[in-house]
């Protein structure tokens, strides 16, 4: 895809999009002096991006990443995952340096609907956060029996 334009004051401008091996890059070139200069600058940016970066699918949709305790529910745990895939574009050769951490809400109380946000997953490369996405309930959990709700209420009181 390519969008191009030029004016006397802005020079020659170009926005391009290209995909290679599952990775899409978008370049923006502004203020070049000629049509050829903007095409060369755009191509140089694309070449740089495809040469030095790679995209990885870290987690898929609907895969259970962790479980969380659910109070007053028909079950004691709910599986948490993602409602869309999580991708990260990183410098080549840095995949093994990625670190993921998950944060889950405290005291999740039923009912819980499928897709309800109950936490987050954070992906870091060194000290830099490169991706963050909500953790969602992968299934609905209804309220537990009257007895279960009473027991859980007492347990929550002492927590």
Predicted features along the sequence, with ranges:
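Domain-terminus/edge residues, biased toward the C-terminal soluble/receptor-binding domains
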Residues: 4-159
């Amino acid at each position: 895809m390519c969008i191009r334009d030029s004016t006397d004051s802005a020079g020659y401008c170009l926005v391009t999009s290209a995909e290679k091996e599952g990775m899409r890059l978008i370049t923006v070139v502004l203020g070049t002096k000629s049509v050829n200069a903007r095409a060369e600058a755009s191509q140089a940016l694309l070449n740089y991006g495809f040469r030095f970066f790679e995209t990885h699918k870290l987690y898929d949709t609907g895969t259970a990443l962790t479980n969380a305790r659910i109070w007053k529910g028909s079950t004691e745990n709910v599986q948490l995952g993602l409602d869309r895939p999580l991708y990260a574009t990183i410098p080549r050769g840095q995949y093994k340096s990625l670190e993921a951490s998950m944060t889950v809400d405290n005291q999740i109380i039923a009912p819980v609907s499928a897709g309800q946000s109950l936490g987050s997953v954070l992906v870091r490369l060194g000290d830099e956060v490169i991706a963050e996405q909500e953790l969602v309930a992968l299934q609905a959990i209804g309220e537990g029996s009257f007895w279960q709700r009473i027991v859980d209420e007492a347990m929550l009181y002492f927590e």
